[in-house]
Swiss-Prot record:
Family listed: Belongs to the class-III pyridoxal-phosphate-dependent aminotransferase family.
Reaction(s) catalysed (UniProt annotation): L-alanine = D-alanine; L-serine = D-serine
Keywords: Isomerase, Pyridoxal phosphate
Comment on pH dependence: Optimum pH is 6.5-7.0.
Organism: Pyrococcus horikoshii (strain ATCC 700860 / DSM 12428 / JCM 9974 / NBRC 100139 / OT-3)
Protein function: Catalyzes the interconversion of L-alanine and D-alanine, and L-serine and D-serine. Has weak activity with valine and threonine.
Lineage: Archaea, Methanobacteriati, Methanobacteriota, Thermococci, Thermococcales
Protein name, UniProt field: Alanine/serine racemase
EC number(s) recorded for this UniProt protein: 5.1.1.-, 5.1.1.1
The keyword Isomerase is assigned to this record: yes
Thermal dependence summary for this entry: Highly stable at high temperatures.
GO molecular function: alanine racemase activity; identical protein binding; pyridoxal phosphate binding; serine racemase activity; transaminase activity
SUPFAM superfamilies from the UniProt entry: PLP-dependent transferases
Length: 474
């Protein structure tokens, strides 16, 4: 079995026969160091949290080559966005051909056949029946748009969300998020009328319930909190427009709720006419082995927010929602570059690649393989408290002897993996979860190599061989 899908074989023989991973100079190398210093002089620190001192030069499939010639296996996928990997021939061809025809037309003022086809496909694969689409540029502005739709369609002022939620960096998205206080410090006043409730984390929740053994008990605690505390004492339910949720919390640490949670939550929300908005920017477009992670929980949201992987990371997002709520004021969802012909070409190619190459099935099979191997590794190392996920969205929680989060150990494991040629980030509300979100084209052969690196990184960290650690959201 090759390390790349057969569709990648227009690549040169050099790439096909490439050794992976390949570390020719200890990262960061001299060229990377030089560029990082130049960046510090001209780019604001606000643009991101630099998880790794990595400067990519090119990519192919699930691999990234940096400016110093090091080749890494990528378990980050540009924040779970590079769904079809890097430089997929079909994607490259579609984008090149479209640029040669016309690179920009604005769907806010004219019409676009490409954008229409992408919207038709999204409506087809969405679990929401009779839906329409609004296009955006990033997950953050798509969250803002979903807030606007929620308030416009219900004429209600309040938004509910979950503790641990990451929804983006625009003002509205920051306002509904509850991931790290560092992302809100200094920006008040944010959008008013937002309230948060606990997310049903089976492994680590405020009630101390083992949600794997007692899922119904955990579900009931959250729903009781919402109905008998929030709706009775904090926010009038008839003034709540929507509840925003990630079907699987991503940046909070790949937190998978009990299977029946969202189905029961939707029943409660419907009693009060409250919309359920699923933020699937990270979980959607095949990441979990289904087009949308909402499908795992047998729930039909009123809106789904998408982004990241829909155009393989090339800057498309949006909202899919029930027709009766999506027709808002003309022009109020207008963004100049949204779904322009080039981005739409990338999205159309991405959706076709996922279908034609059975990447939903691949995400399930390779994800199950990784989960199985990680659970075997867990049996050998007490520092692994939990392994969880769906498809190619997997979290490994690192803990101390007393079960408390161990971000220090997590950061060192991820740094050692980076030195060995694996891009492996640490995330989580406490910075102690290894996040695995590789491109959907990942094969079992490459995954096995990555797992060998993870196990070695754990051993090297436990024996005191690792001094540095990766940066995380803290």
């Amino acid at each position: 079995m090759p390390f790349l899908p057969f569709s990648y074989y227009p690549f040169s023989l050099e790439v096909i026969l490439m050794e992976y991973p390949k570390i020719v100079v200890k990262p960061p190398g001299p060229r990377a160091k030089e560029l990082i210093e130049r960046e510090k002089k001209v780019l604001s620190t606000g643009i991101g949290v630099k998880l790794f001192p990595l400067v990519p030069k090119r990519g192919f499939g699930p691999f990234i080559e940096d400016v110093d010639g090091n080749v890494f296996i990528d378990f980050l996928a540009g924040a779970a966005a590079a769904s079809t990997g890097y430089a997929h021939p079909k994607l490259v061809k579609a984008v090149k051909e479209q640029v040669e025809l016309i690179q920009h037309s604005m769907i806010g003022y004219t019409h676009s056949e490409r954008a229409i086809r992408v919207a038709e496909k999204l409506v087809e694969i969405s679990p929401i029946e009779n839906s329409k689409v609004i296009f955006g540029l990033s997950g953050s502005d798509a969250v803002d748009m979903a807030i606007k739709v929620s308030k416009f369609s219900t004429r209600r002022p309040w938004i509910l969300a979950f503790i641990g939620a990451y929804h983006g960096q625009t003002l509205g998205a920051t306002s509904v998020a509850s991931f790290q206080v560092s992302q809100k410090r200094g920006y008040s006043p944010l959008m008013p009328n937002v309230f948060w409730i606990p997310y049903p984390n089976p492994f680590r929740n405020i009630w101390g319930i083992n949600g794997y053994e007692e899922p119904d008990e955990l579900i009931n605690r959250v729903l009781d909190y919402l109905e008998y505390y929030v709706f009775s004492h904090v926010v009038p339910p008839d003034e709540v427009a929507a509840l925003f949720a990630e079907p699987i919390q991503g940046d909070a640490g790949i937190v998978v709720p009990p299977e029946n949670f969202f189905k029961e939550l939707k029943k409660l929300l419907e009693e009060y006419g409250i919309l359920l908005v699923m933020d699937e920017v990270q979980t959607g477009i095949g990441r979990t082995g289904k087009w949308f992670a909402s499908e795992w929980f047998n729930v039909k949201p009123d809106m789904i927010i998408f982004g990241k992987g829909v155009a393989s990371g090339m800057g498309l997002s949006g909202v899919i929602g029930r027709k009766e709520i999506m027709d808002i004021t003309s022009g109020s969802a207008l963004l100049t570059p949204a779904a322009n012909p080039v981005i739409s070409a990338a999205a159309e190619a991405t959706l076709e690649i996922i279908e034609e190459e059975n990447l939903l099935k691949n995400a399930l099979e390779v994800g199950e393989f990784i989960m199985g191997r990680l659970k075997e590794i867990k049996e050998r190392f007490e520092i692994i408290g939990d392994v969880r996920g769906k498809g190619l969205m997997i979290g490994v929680e690192i803990v101390k002897e007393n079960g408390r989060p161990d971000p220090e150990m997590t950061g060192k494991i991820c740094w050692r993996a980076f030195e060995l040629g694996l891009i492996l980030p640490s995330y989580g509300m406490f910075g102690n979860v290894i996040r695995i979100t590789p491109p959907l084209v990942l094969t079992k052969e490459v995954a096995e190599k990555a797992l060998e690196i993870i196990e070695r990184a754990i051993k090297d960290t436990l024996t005191g061989k690792v001094e540095r650690k990766v940066v995380t959201w803290h």
